[in-house]
Amino acid sequence: MNRIHAVILDWAGTTVDFGSFAPTQIFVEAFRQAFDVEITLAEARVPMGLGKWQHIEALGKLPAVDARWQAKFGRSMSAADIDAIYAAFMPLQIAKVVDFSSPIAGVIDTIAALRAEGIKIGSCSGYPRAVMERLVPAAAEHGYRPDHWVATDDLAAGGRPGPWMALQNVIALGIDAVAHCVKVDDAAPGISEGLNAGMWTVGLAVSGNEFGATWDAYQTMSKEDVAVRREHAASKLYAAGAHYVVDSLADLPGVIAHINARLAQGERP
């Protein structure tokens, strides 16, 4: 049948961890712990969505971070430096990720509604398997259990922005066509992943990395501040090629209804 059969969901900032704070805070701490180099939360957010080793590599290439590194060490960051920061990052992230495993508001009800429509729930993450093996059961205790998940280091081909994790979900879930899948993510590399996999893509402008606020801060934010942050996030997600941008996963059923109508007219992603 010519309709959406599966959604492939990101984790932090999409289904759990409103604002995607678990990884950002740990990047700051890992740089500090490994080399006594300071980076800001805003800098830590810039490459979000990549695998974590690649994320650290991208952070080292940010002009401001590279300038600090050069001032301290007289050279740019090396692969060995990235390895050292990653080695500091991993135990910190494994220890902390369960503290950020609660589903974002609306996720549980949305998943139930999608399943009632016969839609399968795939997922993938920029987290490596060692982190996911802690996060997945912790999220399950809170009621979020996707049908499948893939970690960024699971596949020999690699992770985002390549299509491989999304396509592995297609295989595992037995979906007949990538055009019948929606990739949902709060960061640009995840949107690119979906596009590279030939899927419809939906960006989340409020719940995730680009908006970058805690749930409590969001609840007390003025309408003006919300609008400014939403526009900033949405512009980045649309620039990455997202077919749709909405606030959070709770808005997804309406988007899928719209996509189903387009599929019925013969449209493709």
Curated annotation (Swiss-Prot):
The record's free-text note on cofactor binding: Binds 1 Mg(2+) ion per subunit.
Cited InterPro entries: HAD-like_hydrolase_sf, HAD-like_sf, HAD-SF_hydro_IA, HAD_sf, PGP-like_dom2, Phosphonoacetald_hydro
Residues involved in Mg(2+) binding: 10, 12, 186
SUPFAM superfamilies in the record: HAD-like (SSF56784)
GO cellular component, one term: cytosol
Catalytic reactions on record: phosphonoacetaldehyde + H2O = acetaldehyde + phosphate + H(+)
Swiss-Prot/TrEMBL cofactor(s): Mg(2+)
Catalytic class of the enzyme: hydrolase
A molecular-function term among this protein's GO annotations: magnesium ion binding
Pfam families: Hydrolase
Protein name: Phosphonoacetaldehyde hydrolase
Source species taxonomy: Bacteria, Pseudomonadati, Pseudomonadota, Gammaproteobacteria, Enterobacterales
